[in-house]
Amino acid sequence: FILFINLILVAPALYYIFYLDVNFLFKSAIYGGEINLKIWFNYFNKLFCISTIALFYYLPFLFSKLSKIDLQKSFNNISLNFSLIILFLIGLYYFNYNVNFGGGGIFFQISNKIFQNLIFFYFVVLISFYILNQIFSLKNENYFLFLLIILSNVQETIYHKYYDPMMIILYLTLFTININSKKFNEKTLSIFAFFYITLMFLYYIKDTI
Protein backbone atom coordinates (compact mmCIF):
# COMPACT_ATOMS: atom_id res chain seq x y z
CA PHE A 1 0.00 0.00 0.00
CA ILE A 2 2.80 2.43 0.92
CA LEU A 3 4.61 1.57 -2.33
CA PHE A 4 1.41 2.28 -4.28
CA ILE A 5 0.99 5.68 -2.59
CA ASN A 6 4.63 6.54 -3.34
CA LEU A 7 4.17 5.63 -7.01
CA ILE A 8 1.16 7.94 -7.20
CA LEU A 9 3.10 10.78 -5.58
CA VAL A 10 6.10 10.34 -7.88
CA ALA A 11 4.00 9.99 -11.04
CA PRO A 12 4.10 13.73 -11.94
CA ALA A 13 7.91 13.73 -11.74
CA LEU A 14 8.18 10.60 -13.89
CA TYR A 15 5.82 12.15 -16.46
CA TYR A 16 7.85 15.36 -16.44
CA ILE A 17 11.21 13.62 -16.88
CA PHE A 18 10.46 10.65 -19.14
CA TYR A 19 7.38 11.64 -21.15
CA LEU A 20 8.00 15.37 -21.59
CA ASP A 21 11.76 14.67 -21.75
CA VAL A 22 12.61 17.56 -19.44
CA ASN A 23 15.45 15.74 -17.72
CA PHE A 24 16.85 18.46 -15.48
CA LEU A 25 18.65 15.85 -13.35
CA PHE A 26 21.25 15.24 -16.04
CA LYS A 27 21.66 18.76 -17.37
CA SER A 28 24.43 21.18 -16.56
CA ALA A 29 23.61 23.98 -14.14
CA ILE A 30 24.99 26.43 -16.71
CA TYR A 31 23.02 26.64 -19.96
CA GLY A 32 24.91 24.96 -22.80
CA GLY A 33 27.55 23.56 -20.47
CA GLU A 34 28.46 19.99 -19.60
CA ILE A 35 27.80 18.18 -16.36
CA ASN A 36 30.70 18.46 -13.91
CA LEU A 37 30.70 15.23 -11.91
CA LYS A 38 33.01 16.73 -9.28
CA ILE A 39 30.26 19.24 -8.52
CA TRP A 40 27.36 16.85 -9.09
CA PHE A 41 28.67 14.40 -6.48
CA ASN A 42 30.12 17.01 -4.14
CA TYR A 43 27.92 16.52 -1.10
CA PHE A 44 29.83 19.14 0.85
CA ASN A 45 28.22 21.69 -1.47
CA LYS A 46 24.85 20.27 -0.53
CA LEU A 47 25.71 20.03 3.17
CA PHE A 48 26.84 23.66 3.36
CA CYS A 49 24.00 25.18 1.33
CA ILE A 50 21.18 23.04 2.73
CA SER A 51 22.37 23.59 6.32
CA THR A 52 22.07 27.36 5.91
CA ILE A 53 18.66 26.95 4.25
CA ALA A 54 17.51 24.71 7.14
CA LEU A 55 18.72 27.35 9.60
CA PHE A 56 16.83 30.06 7.71
CA TYR A 57 13.55 28.15 8.09
CA TYR A 58 14.22 27.57 11.79
CA LEU A 59 14.65 31.29 12.51
CA PRO A 60 10.92 32.06 12.95
CA PHE A 61 10.74 29.35 15.62
CA LEU A 62 13.56 31.10 17.48
CA PHE A 63 12.24 34.63 17.02
CA SER A 64 8.77 33.61 18.19
CA LYS A 65 10.31 31.77 21.16
CA LEU A 66 8.56 28.54 20.19
CA SER A 67 11.96 26.95 20.49
CA LYS A 68 15.03 27.80 22.51
CA ILE A 69 18.67 26.87 22.09
CA ASP A 70 21.70 27.22 24.32
CA LEU A 71 24.73 27.74 22.11
CA GLN A 72 26.94 28.31 25.12
CA LYS A 73 26.36 24.68 26.08
CA SER A 74 27.51 23.56 22.63
CA PHE A 75 30.54 25.86 22.64
CA ASN A 76 31.65 24.39 25.97
CA ASN A 77 31.55 20.83 24.59
CA ILE A 78 35.16 20.21 23.51
CA SER A 79 34.52 16.97 21.60
CA LEU A 80 31.58 18.53 19.78
CA ASN A 81 33.65 21.59 18.88
CA PHE A 82 36.40 19.39 17.50
CA SER A 83 33.98 17.29 15.41
CA LEU A 84 32.07 20.24 13.96
CA ILE A 85 35.18 22.27 13.18
CA ILE A 86 36.86 19.29 11.47
CA LEU A 87 33.70 18.72 9.42
CA PHE A 88 33.60 22.42 8.56
CA LEU A 89 37.27 22.55 7.52
CA ILE A 90 36.96 19.46 5.31
CA GLY A 91 33.84 20.92 3.72
CA LEU A 92 35.60 24.26 3.29
CA TYR A 93 38.35 22.54 1.34
CA TYR A 94 35.96 20.75 -1.03
CA PHE A 95 33.26 23.42 -1.35
CA ASN A 96 33.10 24.60 -4.97
CA TYR A 97 29.51 25.67 -5.60
CA ASN A 98 29.58 28.11 -8.51
CA VAL A 99 27.70 31.38 -8.05
CA ASN A 100 26.89 31.25 -11.78
CA PHE A 101 24.65 28.26 -11.10
CA GLY A 102 22.21 30.49 -9.25
CA GLY A 103 20.63 29.29 -6.03
CA GLY A 104 22.75 28.22 -3.09
CA GLY A 105 20.29 29.65 -0.60
CA ILE A 106 19.59 33.18 0.61
CA PHE A 107 22.72 33.40 2.77
CA PHE A 108 24.90 32.27 -0.14
CA GLN A 109 23.35 34.91 -2.39
CA ILE A 110 23.65 37.66 0.24
CA SER A 111 27.30 36.78 0.80
CA ASN A 112 28.07 36.95 -2.92
CA LYS A 113 25.95 39.89 -4.00
CA ILE A 114 26.35 42.19 -1.02
CA PHE A 115 29.76 41.28 0.43
CA GLN A 116 31.29 40.00 -2.84
CA ASN A 117 32.85 37.02 -1.07
CA LEU A 118 31.90 33.87 0.84
CA ILE A 119 33.10 34.88 4.33
CA PHE A 120 29.60 35.69 5.58
CA PHE A 121 28.26 32.47 4.06
CA TYR A 122 30.94 30.34 5.72
CA PHE A 123 30.21 32.01 9.06
CA VAL A 124 26.51 31.15 8.70
CA VAL A 125 27.43 27.57 7.75
CA LEU A 126 29.40 27.12 10.96
CA ILE A 127 26.62 28.63 13.07
CA SER A 128 24.15 26.38 11.24
CA PHE A 129 26.16 23.31 12.23
CA TYR A 130 25.97 24.27 15.91
CA ILE A 131 22.28 25.20 15.92
CA LEU A 132 21.11 22.23 13.84
CA ASN A 133 23.16 19.83 15.92
CA GLN A 134 21.55 21.18 19.08
CA ILE A 135 17.97 20.96 17.82
CA PHE A 136 18.52 17.53 16.23
CA SER A 137 20.28 16.04 19.27
CA LEU A 138 16.93 15.32 20.93
CA LYS A 139 16.64 12.18 18.79
CA ASN A 140 19.13 10.38 16.54
CA GLU A 141 16.51 9.88 13.83
CA ASN A 142 16.64 13.64 13.20
CA TYR A 143 20.17 13.32 11.83
CA PHE A 144 19.10 10.50 9.53
CA LEU A 145 16.17 12.54 8.23
CA PHE A 146 18.43 15.51 7.55
CA LEU A 147 20.87 13.21 5.73
CA LEU A 148 18.00 12.06 3.50
CA ILE A 149 17.18 15.69 2.73
CA ILE A 150 20.78 16.27 1.63
CA LEU A 151 20.92 13.07 -0.45
CA SER A 152 17.60 13.90 -2.11
CA ASN A 153 19.23 16.76 -4.01
CA VAL A 154 20.72 14.83 -6.92
CA GLN A 155 21.47 17.65 -9.36
CA GLU A 156 24.17 20.31 -9.45
CA THR A 157 21.96 23.20 -8.37
CA ILE A 158 20.61 23.85 -4.88
CA TYR A 159 17.75 26.33 -4.81
CA HIS A 160 16.22 27.85 -1.70
CA LYS A 161 12.72 27.38 -3.13
CA TYR A 162 13.20 23.59 -3.15
CA TYR A 163 12.74 23.64 0.63
CA ASP A 164 9.87 26.13 0.91
CA PRO A 165 7.71 25.38 2.87
CA MET A 166 8.97 21.80 3.24
CA MET A 167 11.44 22.55 6.04
CA ILE A 168 8.87 24.27 8.25
CA ILE A 169 6.43 21.40 7.69
CA LEU A 170 9.15 18.88 8.59
CA TYR A 171 10.07 20.82 11.73
CA LEU A 172 6.43 20.60 12.81
CA THR A 173 5.91 16.96 11.85
CA LEU A 174 8.71 14.46 11.17
CA PHE A 175 11.54 16.10 13.10
CA THR A 176 11.48 15.48 16.83
CA ILE A 177 12.56 18.84 18.21
CA ASN A 178 11.79 20.98 21.22
CA ILE A 179 8.88 23.22 20.17
CA ASN A 180 6.56 24.70 22.77
CA SER A 181 3.17 24.45 21.06
CA LYS A 182 1.52 26.24 23.99
CA LYS A 183 3.12 29.48 22.82
CA PHE A 184 1.26 29.51 19.51
CA ASN A 185 -0.69 32.76 19.50
CA GLU A 186 -1.41 35.83 17.35
CA LYS A 187 2.09 37.19 17.93
CA THR A 188 3.59 33.91 16.76
CA LEU A 189 1.49 33.92 13.61
CA SER A 190 2.51 37.53 12.96
CA ILE A 191 6.19 36.57 13.15
CA PHE A 192 5.69 33.71 10.69
CA ALA A 193 3.68 35.98 8.38
CA PHE A 194 6.41 38.64 8.49
CA PHE A 195 9.00 35.95 7.82
CA TYR A 196 7.22 34.80 4.66
CA ILE A 197 6.58 38.34 3.44
CA THR A 198 10.30 39.02 3.83
CA LEU A 199 11.11 35.78 2.01
CA MET A 200 8.83 36.68 -0.91
CA PHE A 201 10.41 40.14 -1.07
CA LEU A 202 13.88 38.57 -1.25
CA TYR A 203 12.69 36.28 -4.04
CA TYR A 204 11.42 39.34 -5.88
CA ILE A 205 14.62 41.39 -5.63
CA LYS A 206 17.14 38.54 -5.89
CA ASP A 207 18.04 39.50 -9.47
CA THR A 208 18.66 43.13 -8.60
CA ILE A 209 20.69 43.04 -5.38
What are these regions (language model features)?
Residues F1, P60-F75, Y130-K139, L174-I191:
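Membrane-interface junctions at the ends of membrane-embedded or membrane-associated helices
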Residues F1-G105, T198-D207:
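Membrane-lumen/periplasm interface segments of specific transmembrane helices
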Residues N6, F75-F88, K139-I150, N180-L202:
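Signature aromatic-anchored transmembrane alpha helix within multi-pass, membrane-resident enzymes
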Residues W40-P60, I106-I131, I158-I177:
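Hydrophobic/aromatic-rich transmembrane helices and adjacent perimembrane loops
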Residues I86-L147:
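Flexible internal linker/loop segments at domain or repeat junctions
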Residues N142, Y162-Y163, T208-I209:
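Extracytoplasmic loop-helix module adjacent to an early transmembrane segment
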Residues S152-T157:
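C-terminal, well-structured subdomains that either form a transmembrane helix-short loop-helix hairpin
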Residues K161-M167, Y171-F175, T188-Y204:
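C-terminal transmembrane-bundle signature of multipass membrane proteins
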